């Protein structure tokens, strides 16, 4: 079962075994691509595209399509609902998003989910100022 999928929540742990009590070995971030190696009702065995890491995640919060246009370029990009009210949620550095709409200083990346325009860069952006990277 070799398919490409994208994770659609903030992030989740990758476990060594099919249990939340198992050792956490890595994480999958919002918009990160992965391949499903096997699946059952509650768990997916995956291989991440970024670093080829293999492990288990819960069988939820993923989709087959995701047109990535930008990446989060701050440690934590706060998520706002209706681009006015800050929520407790955030997207971590390197999360990959699709810009759906732009309003003022905010971009919409999902229904009722907005982040500040200054928190993202185009997906193909390469930072040449290494001091700027170290400040992140």
Predicted features and spans:
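SH3-family beta-barrel domains
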Residues: 1-19, 27-30, 37-40, 47-50, ...
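Long hydrophobic alpha-helices with heptad-repeat/coiled-coil character
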Residues: 120-122
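Second-shell loop/turn segments in exported
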Residues: 136
């Amino acid at each position: 079962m070799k398919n490409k999928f994208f994770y659609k929540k903030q992030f989740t742990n990758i476990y060594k075994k099919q249990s939340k009590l198992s050792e956490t070995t890595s994480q999958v971030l919002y918009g990160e691509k992965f391949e499903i190696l096997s699946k059952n009702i509650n768990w997916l065995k995956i291989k991440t595209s970024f670093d080829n890491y293999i492990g288990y995640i819960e069988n939820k919060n993923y989709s087959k399509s995701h047109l990535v246009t930008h990446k989060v370029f701050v440690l934590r990009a706060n998520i706002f609902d209706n681009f006015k009210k800050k929520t407790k949620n955030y997207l971590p550095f390197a999360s990959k998003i699709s810009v759906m709409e732009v309003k003022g200083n905010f971009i919409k990346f999902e229904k009722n989910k907005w982040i500040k325009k200054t928190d993202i860069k185009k997906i193909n952006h390469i930072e040449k100022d290494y001091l700027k990277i170290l400040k992140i």
